[in-house]
Amino acid sequence: MTHPRAIAGIVGVLLSVISMAVGAAGQGDARGADLIVPHESWSCGLPDGIPRPEGGTLVFEAEMTLDRVADIGRTQYGQRQVAVVQGGTLTGTRVNGSVMTGALDFELTLANGVIEVEQIYVLRTSDGRYVYVRAAGTGADAKDVRLVMDFEAPTASDIAWLNAGTYVGRRVLNATSRTMTLRVYDVSAAKPAAGSRQAVRITKPAGVPPQPWDYRKAAPIEKRGNQLITETVTLSPSQSVGPSKRGPRNIIPITGGELTGRIAGKVLPGGADYQNLSPPATIDARYLWQTADGEIIIVRNGGAFGSLVPTFEVRVESSYAWLNTGTYLSSNPEMRPGGVGLTFFESTR
């Protein structure tokens, strides 16, 4: 008769073997896993699993310097950090160029150690063409974060191949030196290595709202209430991608500005108004405010002209935390010298 302790030992070994095949974030180490399966609320465009980038073919490497790395603190979604890119270089076998000033890196750390990342870039190739990039990534912890890259390149160009295929990146961000490296691989033909661990599934703590991928859309019955904030935003010249896989794309970089009203402060350099000019034209402006007393607030203002909706993300312990839970509406941008002016309102029904 087998001793109970021996049975327990055998069961433990079997469980260890099983956990090598399918793990869960917070319960095991994701390093070396064939796939990281994202949480359904942050699918990264590859809901069935993100492969190891190094299993593919290197497409390019970007070396960037950072203008700032802002520790926002604990927001309604988790522990938030935002990095703003000052500029960078892009080198690869098929594409070379630069990373434009103002790219954004949003990093979210959840209570169980899970990491979620969103990045927004504009690249400029050596022959002067612009490429709009938006990436979503995740990892069980900071040791293995994988970014799924989505490119919008000009369809009538020799880099139109970026519009197809599957690309996964690996980023290394050093807040102390204010540098970031991004290596992007084509994993379209990548196969999991035989005998390696199969998948790690991302889990999330209960009761925490998921961060949104898209901007909020106003309900038909919403209307403008009390005036909240007026902002003036200074802008750089447009960076036009032109016709691409989702329609004509145009980017207008944000270089600064100021805000008055219920909140006083300034618009920080970085981010942009990311426009899709397919009818009906839409904008998705992403940028940062800094209040007069030093609080950093993440701002997003998106939608079609005539129905723009701003949303906010700020530290939950701050005196501006009411921004996290309210609903708001925005005016259309009005032309001002060197930029635009906007007014934000409380939303009523």
Predicted regions, residues:
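Bacterial N-terminal signal peptides that target proteins for export
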Residues: 1-11
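Beta-strand-enriched cores of mature, soluble protein domains
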Residues: 31-349
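Bacterial N-terminal signal peptides
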Residues: 9-19
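Signal peptide processing junction and immediate N-terminal pro/mature segment
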Residues: 21-32
